[in-house]
Every structure is written in C-alpha cells, then in structure tokens.
A protein has these predicted regions:
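Mid-domain alpha/beta scaffold segments of enzyme catalytic cores
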Residues: 3-251
Length: 251
C-alpha cells in the first residue's frame, strides 16, 4: 500500500478514498483511513452482498458512518448484472434479487441522511430501478454516481437532480462516446474523477491492474472533453472532492 500511495503522491494525488464490499472489508477500509492521514473511507455493504445486511451489520455500519474518517456511505446501490451469479468472492454466495438490494439501498440512504455523509452509488444495468428509488427516498446532501457508466439520457436526468457524476477509466475507452459527452455537459460542481481500482484501468494501460496513480489519465481525458488544461481540471475535481467529502485536501 505504501508504494502505491507514494506513486499516487508523486503524480499529484492529494488523497484516497477506499472502500470495502462486505462488512469486514469495510471495517478494514476504515482502519486504513485511521492509520493513513491521506486516506479516507466510504462505508457500506456492496449491493452484491446485500443479503448480509442484517440487524447486527446495520448497527456496525451505523457506528462506522459517524466516524470522522468515514466520508461517504458507499458503495451501495443496485446491480442487476450479477443477480444469480457467483461474483467470485470467497463466501461463494450469489448476488441477491433487486428487491433485497433495494431494501439494503434504502437503509444506506437513510444512513447517509442521518450521518450527513455523501451517498456513493454503485449501479450496473439497473438505471430505471435506481432512479426510481433515489426519487422517492429521502435526499442525502450529496449523491455520487460512482464509476458512472450509464447512457446519456440517464446522465442528463441525474444531473438535473443534482447528482455528481464520477468518471473512471472507462471514459477513455474508444467506444464510450456517450460517457465523454456526459463529461462535457456536466456542470463543474457535479463532476469527479476516480480510479475504481483495481478495475477500469484507463488507456493506455487498459488491462493492467489499476491504482490511484493512473487517475491522471482519466482526468486528462475529461479535461480534453471540457476544453480545460489537465491542471485546471485537477483543481476543479479536487475542490469538488474536498467539498463533497468535507475534507481538507490542501487547496
């Protein structure tokens, strides 16, 4: 971890937000944030493990949500792609139904509202259901659509609602012109860039293991779409991250 952090620092990354998928991994993410002063944590149970959100797990998440090193409730959301499939996790369990995922999502939304933390959304092939739930649930202070990968009409609807689009390495992929258009039209205060490490490695390193040091390639692509210098885009998204997460990034 130290080497990855050093490589990130060397290219101007001022902080890292780490996540877990299950409750134990989320607790480890928060422990990492306690140990490293430039690492923060998002705390939640991933939708592919929504069936594990028991009463005990909810209490553990509630305690983590109010921790000062927790800056967001996430990743939570809906994932239709993995339903009925084994994600390859060690537990061997299949991803539960959308109904089970929705119940967990609504808990996480309430938790974001209670704690005042941003809501970090994972969405895979569940646009309509996700927009429905977000529309009729309580509204957190900020909603981040993590690793935004949806069609342009979903981007426009999300931006109209005030959600933040967070672009990962797939915005650099040749086929994803609609993602680049979304990056062009997003208001400046509603845009972030991220790695989604170890996945979604941007060009020209696509296929390699992703890490925070590669986020500059994603930022450069988004900057080009918006007609900005990479440095200007970097300052923009750093300021947005500091505001949304409520942290000091040395601006």
């Amino acid at each position: 971890m130290y080497k990855r952090q050093d490589r990130a620092n060397a290219v101007g990354v001022r902080g890292v937000c780490t996540v877990g998928d299950g409750i134990e991994e989320t607790e480890k993410a928060l422990q990492a944030a306690e140990f490293h002063d430039r690492v923060w944590a998002a705390c939640a149970v991933h939708p592919t493990k929504a069936q594990t959100v028991t009463g005990e797990v909810r209490e553990r998440l509630r305690e983590m949500a109010f921790h000062p090193r927790c800056v967001a409730i996430g990743e939570t959301g809906l994932d239709a792609y993995w339903i009925g499939k084994d994600t390859g996790a060690d537990d061997g369990e299949e991803t539960p139904s959308i109904e089970v995922q929705e119940e967990a999502l609504r808990f996480h939304i309430d938790l974001a509202c209670e704690s005042g933390k941003a809501l970090m959304i994972h969405n895979r092939e569940a646009d309509a259901d996700l927009l429905r739930v977000l529309a009729d649930a309580p509204q957190p202070e900020s909603v981040i659509l993590h690793c935004f990968s949806s069609p342009l009409d979903v981007a426009k609807e999300s931006l109209d609602r005030g959600y933040v689009l967070s672009f990962a390495g797939n915005v650099t992929f040749k086929r994803n012109e609609e993602l680049r258009e979304a990056a062009r039209i997003a208001p400046p205060e509603q845009i972030l860039v991220e790695t989604d490490a170890p996945y979604m490695t941007p060009e020209p390193f696509r296929g390699a293991r992703n890490e925070p040091a590669f986020v500059g390639y994603t930022a450069a692509c988004v900057a080009e779409q918006r007609g900005l210098a990479p440095e200007a885009l970097g300052e923009l998204v750093t300021g947005n991250a500091a505001r949304i997460y409520g942290i000091d990034l040395g601006m």
